[in-house]
Amino acid sequence: MSTEKTYPMTQEGKQKLENELEQLKTVRRKEVVERIKIARSFGDLSENSEYDAAKDEQAFVEGRITQLENMIRNAVIIKDTGEVSTVVTLGKTVTFKELPNGDEEAYTIVGSAEADPFEGRISNDSPIAKSLLGKQIGEKVTIQTPGGEMQVEIVSVK
């Protein structure tokens, strides 16, 4: 049995990672190698900040390539069945209103590999998602956040 971590994600999220990996392997890797060549041409490497910066960037790019390959290899695709659901599950967009003020927020709950709060995609490991997963429309939920406790009511699940 494999002990490697799995990465739940949508097909769209996996495609984004594959695109980033391709870009790193075909474009960024070559750019960094070229920067290293240029920096080497400046002579003494012991005091060559351009060379050090290029080597640091190379280490970052290679590390990210390894990370992406691992995430893609261990991806578990969240299938959107298209079925209407009343229960909050991974891959669904949940709308809730804060109590008592009624302000509404909506988030799509995804795996950590494709989470981007600025795009409304939160990780299933986040405090908000952990509190909402498995709950139903109409349920009132208390969410523990770093900023304190928040009461919400689930309005819709898509």
From Swiss-Prot:
SUPFAM superfamilies: FKBP-like, GreA transcript cleavage protein, N-terminal domain. Residues 3-75 form a coiled coil. The keyword Transcription regulation applies. The keyword Transcription applies. It comes from the Bacteria. GO terms for molecular function: DNA binding; RNA polymerase binding. Keywords: Coiled coil, DNA-binding, Transcription, Transcription regulation. GO terms for biological process: DNA-templated transcription elongation; regulation of DNA-templated transcription elongation. NCBIfam families: greA, PRK00226.1-2, PRK00226.1-4. Belongs to the GreA/GreB family. Necessary for efficient RNA polymerase transcription elongation past template-encoded arresting sites. The arresting sites in DNA have the property of trapping a certain fraction of elongating RNA polymerases that pass through, resulting in locked ternary complexes. Cleavage of the nascent transcript by cleavage factors such as GreA or GreB allows the resumption of elongation from the new 3'terminus. GreA releases sequences of 2 to 3 nucleotides. This is Transcription elongation factor GreA. The gene is greA.
